[in-house]
């Protein structure tokens, strides 16, 4: 219980933990990692090759994973165990999918994720930048597994967690999935404004959600 209380106090203070402070970086720095992989692929001529060896496939997959977690809001490890389908009829409603309808039309279907009970099935359209990178990957990954481990089998969530750390090694920081999400949220949310909203909601004896409903432009 005491540990729980300490954790909640830490979260509510909005202060970084010691470990977070040590490894904290910026979105700009994370984007640089993605651009680093792109440059590596271009300089090695990998993007123009028809067939890639294992090392080249791994470099391309690192580029893909860096893009998955920087070109859109970073989800948890739900790309682990993800399958590739081309038709919604193939969605059995149990696992997560990359729905590949065509070269310019793709989406992620999430059936299995942490908040599935309260949120239900989610479909997220893929933006054009990420779509281009996925196309490069699918040109060489002909399996129905979205991400691959070192044995060319489906990458599970545990393996993806370790892989993310390897992908972001160029930052010289220990970048975990959790830290990635904290960095992204911190740069996209006005914390002072949110604190002000919460204080006002407390003083008016209603929830912050209700307050948003009440607010008019």
Language-model features: locations:
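N-terminal DNA-binding recognition helix of tyrosine site-specific recombinases/integrases
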Residues: 1-35, 74-75
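Basic, Lys/Arg- and aromatic-enriched nucleic-acid-binding interface segment
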Residues: 31-78
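A short, glycine-centered helix-capping/turn motif at helix boundaries
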Residues: 58-62, 68-91, 191-195, 204-205
